């Protein structure tokens, strides 16, 4: 099984005190089965630029994300899936932010299971396989602080 890590799943690893349950699970996943999306890295960079300690956060992303997970591009094939999902959800009266739909489309196109802490949110996207390990690890450690 191969996985695409959502922004919150990558952010968890970058936290000062990440979930030990999540880190143990992640350590068992071979490097070649770990992916994220260029959309996720964009969200991470946006967050870094919002911090006063911008350079520290930027360096953390650059040193700890691309060397560890394969960053998949957002391309024409993925954008077609995005368009299909977006149209389907709009017809159903559901609105999900475009970045999340782009991340989901990347996972669907590449046949990857999405690791996210936001199962309810992404669960509305047809054809998307979700992995609840991050959400479960958070419920196992409700008093964890960053």
Question: What is each stretch, according to the model?
Answer:
Residues 36-39, 117:
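Substrate-recognition element of Asp-dependent hydrolases with the DxDx(T/V) motif
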Residues 6-7, 44, 82, 107, ...:
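Generic structural signal for small/hydrophobic residues in well-ordered secondary structure
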Residues 30, 67, 125-126:
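Short, structured coil segments at secondary-structure junctions
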Residues 70-117, 143-146:
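Active-site neighborhoods of divalent-metal-dependent phosphate/nucleic-acid chemistry enzymes
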Residues 1-36, 48-64, 91, 136-144:
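Short, well-structured N-terminal submotif of metal-dependent ribonuclease cores
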């Amino acid at each position: 099984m191969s996985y695409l890590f959502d922004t919150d799943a990558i952010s968890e690893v970058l936290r000062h005190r990440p979930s030990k349950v999540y880190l143990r699970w992640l350590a068992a996943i071979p490097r070649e089965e770990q992916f994220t999306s260029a959309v996720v890295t964009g969200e991470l960079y946006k967050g870094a630029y919002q911090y006063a300690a911008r350079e520290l956060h930027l360096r953390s992303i650059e040193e700890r994300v691309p060397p560890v997970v394969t960053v998949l591009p957002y391309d024409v094939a993925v954008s077609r899936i995005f368009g299909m999902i977006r149209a389907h959800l709009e017809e159903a009266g559901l609105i999900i932010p475009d970045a999340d739909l782009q991340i989901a489309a990347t996972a669907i196109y590449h046949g990857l299971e999405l690791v996210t802490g936001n199962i309810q949110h992404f669960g509305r996207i047809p054809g998307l396989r979700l992995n609840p390990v991050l959400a479960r690890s958070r419920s196992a450690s409700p008093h964890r602080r960053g």
